[in-house]
Amino acid sequence: MRVVRQLNELEEALTLSRSEAKNAFGDDNVLLERFIEGPRHIEFQIFGDQHGNFVHLHERECSIQRRHQKILEESPSPFLDGTLRKQMAEASLKAANAVQYLGAGTVEFIVGEDRSFYFIEMNTRLQVEHPVTEMQTGLDLVEWQIRVASGEKLPLDQDQIRPQGHSIEAVSYTHLTLPTIVGV
């Protein structure tokens, strides 16, 4: 991967990237994408039922990472203001509605320093971080998933889902930095 900040850097970066791709994978095709300065990783928990109802259960921020692994998962995001939070929530519901999504899902975005946001992916399941949302909303998302899978309507409408307080989940990583000692 290479970041190109000036147009005159593009040709050389593309040539090098194609060469590396060819050597590593036998194919010199490359993908160009926008580089986001100071990215924030924000995800919205959503639910859809068989009756055409969709809700979001607010956001989680997981921008603090090490080696692309989440360290902190936090709700609400300290980065989002009310306007951006509303825009992203609406985009999440629009995505769910577009595919008539059923069950629990997570719509993930990257947000730049300029507060522009970009869709990354949708995870079509409850994620391991869902207790952050449960703590902040007071709702049992596993129960919701079972009810929706059984054909029931969503238990609450959007205006009944209110965040309460602040929730943080932390992961502790241990890395052995000394040479491994046999038997230890």
Predicted regions and their residues:
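Single conserved hydrophobic/aromatic residue that forms the stacking wall/gate
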Residues: 175-184
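ATP-dependent carboxylate activation and anion-phosphoryl transfer catalytic cores
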Residues: 3-176
